[in-house]
Amino acid sequence: MRILNYTIINLVMSKHLLLNINKTQKGIIHIIGIGGIGMSAIAEILHNSNCKVQGSDAQSNDNINKLQKLGIEVFIGHNANNISQAQIVVHSSAIEFDNVELIAAKNNNKTVLHRSDILAEIMKGKYVIAVSGSSGKTTTTAMIASIFDHSGIDATVTVGGILNSYKSNFKLGGSDTFLIEADESDGTMLKIPAKIAVITSINNDHIDYYGTFDNIKNAFSQFVNNAGSAVLPDSVDIDYDAGNSITFGFENGSIRASNIKQHANSIEFDVLNNWIPALRAGMTKGKCTEMSSQCVTLGSSPLKNIVLSNAIGIHKVSNALAAISVAIKLGISDADIKKGLLEFQGVARRFSLIADIKGVKLIEDYAHHPNEIYATLTAARSITKGKVIGIIEPLRFARIRNFFDEFIRIFMMFDYVILTPVHPPEDKPIPGCGIDDIQKALISNGFNNTKIMNDALLISHFISDSTSPSNIVLFIGAGSNIAKLAKETAALIAEVKV
């Protein structure tokens, strides 16, 4: 991968700073929020590129522990002094404008880069497959990675979750192929120089950034048209170059799933392929090559008896169709596609089984948008006729405000709902959008099976007293608190039920 030979001068914007770093070769890159799932991957990439990297975060976590083991210095807590030796300061949209390090960087004329800018620089000259969408990005990227791993493509992979096969959110590859999960929440995907742009789904999330749903659709349209080669659901309503794209779905897509069978921890299905290129792309010594823009539609070429391991729910089939579409575009063989999906090990916190205690399954899922929570609930219903209890950590007051009625409607589909505090804890409350407001709305609509809890011991007692074999308890949310509650609760229940 050529980035290994890059110097730090390739990763900055300022010409003045370029000269300074070129002379010293000792420029330090400071990453604010380095423990985040995306920022920690950037830190690893830069570290493996022989750049001197450091960073800071409000608290330690597993990502930070891993970075520290690599020799990367991490400051716990934000302080202006943390960036005193840095020449470049990198931040994401999650960092508030009043962050003391960000302010200090600007006041001291440091080069300040957004995450998207440094990613764009890192990927220049690479063969980039970028996966974006309102939901399903992480799982789809992980499935593509698994197919690559079983087809000779040694790609660098960065993803917004911990892949069970890598035990990491990052894998350094040995080729120029770069597979990345591209964040749509702040328009980052528009700066990624993708050869193939993948859209998993589009919904009206992140309205606070985009303003309108039309703006969201226009951004995704720009994303795929920038790439010139696209993979997208057959249901999306955006403008794109249809001549150089593959659509996937269950009814009208060029790549369609049929004969879907849900098993205990896998899904079996067939795929009809109506997209056959005039010139199949191929791999030359493990390197991706560009697909011809010309394609013809011939008779369906079925791919039979695909087994997707570690997957529950129809939405996982949709993710797999996107991954299969990318593989078909690259000319990967049917056998390698099937092998990659059969060996798929899943992603942490994506319908992940934490414990099965005397027939009661405790499952963790990252869902935080109403559509995602509904998909998670539907997946649970597909494997049990018993009760499904949701322990739910809402993500941000603004999202509660934007989707309040949708949350109420979907929460009422559970047998019981326990609400935990809104994540992140520093999020500014919005009147009428707290968990107590959600509970009141549920009760006023006739749904009385709801509590507010934030203590693993209390939750464990409730689950022990209220569940029986074949019941499922879903820990739902994107924050760190719900993940901690899930692990602690599982341990406590195991002690009680032994």
Swiss-Prot record:
> Where, in this chain's numbering, is ATP bound?
G133, S134, S135, G136, K137, T138, T139
Pathway, per UniProt? Cell wall biogenesis; peptidoglycan biosynthesis
Report a single Gene Ontology molecular function: ATP binding
For this protein, what reaction is catalysed? UDP-N-acetyl-alpha-D-muramate + L-alanine + ATP = UDP-N-acetyl-alpha-D-muramoyl-L-alanine + ADP + phosphate + H(+)
- GO BP term, pick one: cell division
Q: Which InterPro entries match?
A: Mur-like_cat_sf, Mur_ligase_C, Mur_ligase_C_dom_sf, Mur_ligase_cen, Mur_ligase_N, MurCDEF_pg_biosynth, UDP-N-AcMur_Ala_ligase_MurC
Where does it localize? Cytoplasm
Q: What class of enzyme is it?
A: ligase
**What are the record keywords, sorted?**
ATP-binding, Cell cycle, Cell division, Cell shape, Cell wall biogenesis/degradation, Cytoplasm, Ligase, Nucleotide-binding, Peptidoglycan synthesis
Q: What is its EC number?
A: 6.3.2.8
Q: Name one GO cellular component term.
A: cytoplasm
Database matches in Gene3D superfamilies = Mur ligase, C-terminal domain, Mur-like, catalytic domain, NAD(P)-binding Rossmann-like Domain
Superkingdom, taxonomy of origin: Bacteria
What family name appears in the similarity comment? Belongs to the MurCDEF family.
Role this protein plays: Cell wall formation.
The protein's name: UDP-N-acetylmuramate--L-alanine ligase
Its lineage opens with:
Bacteria, Pseudomonadati, Pseudomonadota, Alphaproteobacteria, Rickettsiales
